[in-house]
Amino acid sequence: MNKWQAIKLAQRYKAAVAERLPLKALYLYGSYSKGNHTEDSDIDIAVVVERMSDDYFEDTPLLWKLKRKISNLIEPVLLTEDTNNPLYADILKTGILI
């Protein structure tokens, strides 16, 4: 899979997530955004919400359930816009806003 195919899958995933969660942003990050992906790479996606809901333990499995409808290569992570979070800070630097 090439970078543009990963972006297309991320766009489809964003549409599915936006129907179920109050989505603030969605980023493609990791190997596809950095350009060092291989044929075995997963598709790292950061789902950014304004704040975590009380249903975090329901929201996270929902992300995994929705990914199965798009591609099992998608590896979602649920985040807030906490710039003190090293993962989120890295995503802001190297990720692709979808």
Enumerate the predicted regions with their spans.
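Catalytic core of pol beta-like nucleotidyltransferases
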Residues: 1-25, 33-39, 50-98
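Short glycine- and acidic-residue-rich catalytic loops of nucleotidyl-transferase/cyclase enzymes
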Residues: 41-43
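Short beta-strand->loop micro-motif that forms the acidic, two-metal-ion catalytic signature
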Residues: 45-47
